[in-house]
């Protein structure tokens, strides 16, 4: 084949770029000298996991110090859809103490233990109760993987430790507890990897927050990683880390209150430059190229804190590592962005100025702090808050954070073991122990030896030939579709790969409690669907919608309940809506969005499989139902949950997503009454920064349809706000959005409720069940919020963030009044509620004299305030916990 000179030059250029890229990647990676991946209970052959890492079996392994007769190997009885096969489908089970011995060099090691609580060898998973020790250190004690998974709604658990090995041997002992008598221990996988000594501090510069004394972290200190977050960015999988195989997770699930701040991404022309003395393996480029700030409005920023809340074990000291990198090209000088860092309501850094630390933007920096939480039992909260420092009058009243790592430090007797979390609605999920695949492509973990340029050339040539061959096959039409005859996992690409995905904001808020990996969608065969629904038994019909019927089903041998939506060929909603639903939900994982498990497209069918929502729709509990009436606080919490889901759609994904069909039948309730937004068949990607709207054919549901959208056929996220305002009035009045049996002026709730509001008679159309159960302050705030949502002009409506904030505030007002013994009024005084004629100002409006909903406690607010005579500025406010101040809907059963 003749190649022109131009093509030859282009090929040569591509080759050089590939070699350069390979060299850069290898330079950024740490190369472990030891890497042991032990597949416990596995067969004789080695297996490869989803990150392309090879796991060796422990059967007849040299690492078995104890006799293999003292343990048994067993496969898991069942496999959750979210659980990878390697290393979780086999385990080694111990009924007496059992020791693994790993011959390794002296020095620091990452030790990761992998657990999938299931039935092994016929044993009950709840009877698994054991300790794990290494030398003088107790890593786990009285540990129940089953209880932990249930409490945190995880399918599987990863425990990561940092230990120091001396003497060339790492002995790890698993010991079943003495009680109950049938207790046993198990483990699915063990990872031992060498690491650089990157967390020690022996020079006296590390101090305890709130104290002047220094803290030493040396070889005698063992650590457990409890959180590792990529603030403002995506999840980062182990294969996309810097050779250390750490998992980094999205920070949004941990943000307190509605003050989410805004994600920032390094300017495209900015190169992240690690300073001399800072190894590039400290944190990936993707951590330093994304951040979260408070936003551009100084007035707002000065009235709240950007706050994260973490659940931790009491009785331990914690190492908190914060990662910083100025990502804005506009900030190049000292005193442009200065802020205060608080840890547990104590000042950790009075004047944090990233440029002062680094001398330039685009330069990574990290700083360590040690926190000693108050004494207590069980679990407590660790707070991290940022607030602008106005003392030196910086150019921007703002703050910035790129990454967070939190480690538990061993006690004086070598203990790292905390208590098992208690299942219940108050347990906060911790995704730092769940391995969730991301969209990033795996990169090689084997460092390229310096000087091996020929290896890079060969690699580049191989890649080039593969790409060329793939191109030729595509041209010839040689690609064959995968068979859809059996169930399998089909990757649905989210927003890109590798570093290009760094700015693509995917959230798994709450995603961490999902039953599925965030980037995989299961493909079911039609035979599986028929078996799950008992051949579409009509007695299993849960409901009928525009797309078709929804059936109750069971998959995976009856172990998992699901809802199965079967498309009706005669429905107006067809292939486009089917594809939209898959594309949208496969990209989104959030506590308040219904999870898509998979789909089926065989035999011209269009079938979607979702998580089962035990309590059905919100509407089923408001009117025309035999169900008991919902209490007011529960209605508020459901509205808050739905608002969180919509707020995430509008702001949390890479592009704004407009739902376009918000209504009470599309707000579903799980077994713990956690609200989840559903039905994305009509959803639309919203406008970019360069546009204010999307021109589209009008779609939606009558009674909820934004009149401005209907008139102008221009869709914005404010159309969802309008529809949600109707939902709020439905929750308050317990009547349909449209009721043609009523008088003409009362048919539309979106028109009748505002009319009653303006006339001061809204209390007269409130659900009679709620009379005497809503405090006047709460009623006023809720009514104002709903009213602003349904204003005629979209520009006058609040954002979903504002709506969420005000609903949280309304709930706070209700709870505060109840706790302080204030009475609730059957007849709310509507004369006190002044209609503002639509001239409402959002929290991004600098001219607003009052910041709607800026009420938090002292840990998320820059001001002291009180409600009902109780100060919220005090740490010890008569038991008024953060969960009492703001309903976070942090139910771990939410996914």
From Swiss-Prot:
This is Receptor-like protein kinase FERONIA. Receptor-like protein kinase that mediates the female control of male gamete delivery during fertilization, including growth cessation of compatible pollen tubes ensuring a reproductive isolation barriers, by regulating MLO7 subcellular polarization upon pollen tube perception in the female gametophyte synergids. Required for cell elongation during vegetative growth, mostly in a brassinosteroids- (BR-) independent manner. Acts as an upstream regulator for the Rac/Rop-signaling pathway that controls ROS-mediated root hair development. It comes from Arabidopsis thaliana (Mouse-ear cress). The modification Phosphoserine is found at residues 858, 866, 871, 874. ATP binds at residues 542-550, 565. It catalyses: L-seryl-[protein] + ATP = O-phospho-L-seryl-[protein] + ADP + H(+); L-threonyl-[protein] + ATP = O-phospho-L-threonyl-[protein] + ADP + H(+). It comes from the Eukaryota. Residues 844-895 are annotated as: Disordered. InterPro entries: ANXUR1/2-like (IPR045272), Kinase-like_dom_sf (IPR011009), Malectin-like_Carb-bd_dom (IPR024788), Prot_kinase_dom (IPR000719), Protein_kinase_ATP_BS (IPR017441), Ser-Thr/Tyr_kinase_cat_dom (IPR001245), Ser/Thr_kinase_AS (IPR008271). GO terms for biological process: abscisic acid-activated signaling pathway; brassinosteroid mediated signaling pathway; circadian regulation of gene expression; defense response to fungus; ethylene-activated signaling pathway; negative regulation of abscisic acid-activated signaling pathway; negative regulation of cell growth; pollen tube reception. PANTHER family: OS03G0124300 PROTEIN-RELATED, OS04G0586500 PROTEIN.
């Amino acid at each position: 084949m003749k190649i022109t000179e131009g093509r030859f030059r282009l090929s040569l250029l591509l080759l050089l770029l590939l070699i350069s890229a390979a060299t850069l990647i290898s330079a950024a990676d740490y190369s472990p000298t030891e890497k042991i991946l032990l597949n416990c209970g596995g067969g004789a052959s080695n297996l490869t996991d989803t990150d392309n890492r090879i796991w060796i079996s422990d059967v007849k392994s040299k690492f078995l110090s104890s006799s293999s007769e003292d343990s048994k190997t067993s496969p898991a009885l069942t496999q959750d859809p979210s659980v990878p096969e390697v290393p979780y489908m086999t385990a080694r089970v111990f009924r007496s103490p059992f020791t693994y011995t790993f011959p390794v060099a002296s020095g620091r090691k990452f030790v990761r233990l992998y657990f999938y609580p299931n039935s092994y060898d016929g044993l009950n998973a709840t009877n698994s109760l054991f300790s794990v020790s290494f030398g003088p250190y107790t890593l786990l004690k009285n540990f129940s993987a089953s209880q932990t998974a249930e409490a945190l709604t995880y399918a599987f658990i990863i425990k990561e430790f940092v230990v120091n090995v001396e003497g060339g041997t790492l002995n790890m002992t698993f010991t079943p507890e003495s009680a109950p008598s049938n207790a046993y221990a198990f483990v699915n996988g063990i990872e031992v990897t060498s690491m650089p000594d990157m967390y020690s501090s022996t020079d006296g510069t590390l101090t305890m927050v709130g104290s002047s004394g220094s803290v030493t972290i040396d070889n005698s200190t063992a650590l457990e990683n409890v959180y590792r977050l990529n603030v403002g960015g995506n999840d980062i999988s182990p294969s996309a880390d810097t050779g250390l195989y750490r998992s980094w997770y999205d920070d949004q699930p941990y943000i307190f209150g509605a003050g989410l701040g805004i994600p920032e991404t390094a300017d495209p022309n900015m190169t992240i430059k690690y300073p001399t003395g800072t190894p590039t393996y400290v944190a990936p480029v993707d951590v330093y190229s994304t951040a979260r700030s408070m936003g551009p409005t100084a007035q707002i920023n000065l009235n709240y804190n950007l706050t994260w809340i973490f659940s931790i074990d009491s009785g331990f000291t914690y190492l908190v590592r914060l990662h910083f990198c100025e990502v804005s090209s506009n900030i190049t000088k000292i005193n442009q962005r200065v802020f205060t860092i608080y840890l547990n309501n104590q000042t950790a850094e009075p004047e944090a100025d990233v440029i002062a630390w680094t001398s330039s933007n685009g330069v990574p920096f990290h700083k360590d702090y040690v926190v000693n939480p108050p004494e207590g039992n069980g679990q407590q909260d660790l707070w991290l808050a940022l607030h602008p420092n106005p003392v030196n009058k910086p150019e921007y009243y703002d703050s910035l954070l790129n990454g967070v790592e939190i480690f538990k430090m061993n006690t004086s007797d070598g203990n790292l073991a905390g208590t098992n979390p208690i299942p219940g609605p108050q347990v906060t999920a911790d995704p730092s122990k769940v391995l969730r695949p991301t969209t990033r492509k795996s990169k090689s973990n084997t460092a390229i030896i310096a000087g091996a340029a020929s290896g890079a050339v060969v690699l580049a040539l191989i890649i080039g030939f593969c790409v060329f061959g793939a191109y030729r096959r595509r041209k010839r039409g040689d690609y064959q579709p995968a068979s859809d005859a059996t169930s399998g996992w089909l990757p649905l690409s989210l927003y890109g790969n590798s570093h290009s995905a760094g700015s693509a904001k995917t959230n798994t808020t709450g995603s961490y409690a999902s039953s599925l990996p965030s980037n995989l969608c299961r493909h079911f065969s039609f035979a599986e669907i028929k078996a799950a629904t008992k051949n579409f038994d009509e007695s299993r019909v849960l409901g009928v919608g525009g797309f078709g019927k929804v059936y109750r089903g069971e998959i995976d041998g009856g172990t998992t309940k699901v809802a199965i939506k079967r498309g009706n060929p005669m429905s107006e909603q067809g292939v486009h809506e089917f594809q939209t639903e898959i594309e949208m939900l496969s990209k989104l994982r959030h506590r308040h969005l219904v999870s898509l498990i998979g789909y089926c497209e065989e035999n011209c069918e269009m079938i979607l499989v979702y998580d089962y929502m035990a309590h059905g729709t919100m509407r089923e509990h408001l009117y025309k139902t035999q169900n008991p009436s919902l209490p007011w606080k529960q209605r508020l919490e459901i509205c808050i949950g739905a608002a969180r889901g919509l707020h995430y759609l509008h702001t949390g994904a890479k592009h704004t997503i407009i739902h376009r069909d918000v209504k009470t039948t599309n707000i579903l309730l799980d077994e713990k009454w956690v609200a989840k937004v559903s039905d994305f068949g009509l959803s639309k990607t919203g406008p970019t920064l360069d546009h204010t709207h999307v021109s589209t054919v009008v779609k939606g549901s009558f009674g909820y349809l934004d009149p401005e959208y209907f008139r102008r056929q221009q869709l914005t996220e404010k159309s969802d706000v309008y529809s949600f305002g109707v939902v709020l009035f439905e929750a308050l009045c317990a009547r349909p959005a449209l009721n043609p049996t009523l008088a003409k002026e009362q048919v539309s709730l979106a028109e009748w409720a505002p009319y009653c509001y303006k006339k001061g008679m809204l209390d007269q159309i409130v659900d009679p069940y709620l009379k005497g159960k809503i405090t006047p302050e709460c009623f006023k705030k809720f009514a104002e919020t709903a009213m602003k949502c349904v204003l005629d002009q979209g520009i006058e409506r609040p954002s979903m963030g504002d709506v969420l904030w005000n609903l949280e505030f309304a709930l706070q007002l209700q709870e505060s009044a109840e706790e302080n013994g204030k009475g609730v009024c059957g007849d709310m005084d509507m004369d006190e509620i002044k209609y503002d004629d639509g001239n409402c100002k959002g929290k991004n409006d600098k001219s607003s004299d009052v910041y709607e909903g800026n009420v938090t406690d002292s840990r998320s607010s820059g001001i002291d305030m009180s409600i009902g005579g109780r100060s919220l500025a005090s740490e010890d406010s008569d038991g008024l916990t953060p969960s009492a101040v703001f309903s976070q809907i942090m139910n771990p059963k939410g996914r």
